[in-house]
């Protein structure tokens, strides 16, 4: 398996080298808006530890990440009045992973509303959505 790359985009976001629309942060994790959202409120939850995928992360770090993903999911669903949600974790290219730093996709879902194609989101909209989720905690 390929080693963790400390220059991946999420590592750069953690180091504040690249801006993001932050939803939540604590000592173990960071949640921010996906820049190519497939639904309103689509955000990502990443650990602050360097781990390529689920096979590389320590169990206690994974547990903390899942706890944060649950909190963010609840807030995102409240913010967007979702009647369901999807929580995704992809590992490696064949599993759909595109950024090789373990992360969960949080997708607040509404019945009858399909996923959109992955296209760059408007930054003003992403900032508004991040604020809506932060207010829902």
Residue ranges and their predicted role:
Residues 1-137:
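HIT superfamily nucleotide-processing domains
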């Amino acid at each position: 398996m390929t080693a963790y790359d400390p220059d991946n985009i999420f590592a750069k976001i953690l180091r504040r080298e690249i801006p993001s629309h932050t939803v939540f942060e604590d000592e173990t994790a960071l949640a921010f808006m996906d820049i190519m959202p497939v639904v309103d409120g689509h955000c990502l939850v990443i650990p602050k530890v360097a781990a390529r995928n689920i096979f590389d992360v320590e169990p206690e770090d994974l547990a903390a990440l899942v706890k944060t993903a649950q909190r963010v999911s609840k807030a995102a669903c409240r913010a967007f009045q979702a009647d369901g949600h999807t929580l995704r974790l992809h590992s490696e290219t064949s599993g759909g992973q595109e950024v090789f730093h373990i992360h969960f996709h949080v997708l607040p879902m509404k019945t009858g509303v399909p996923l959109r194609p992955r296209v760059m989101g408007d930054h003003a909209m992403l900032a508004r959505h991040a604020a809506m989720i932060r207010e829902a905690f």
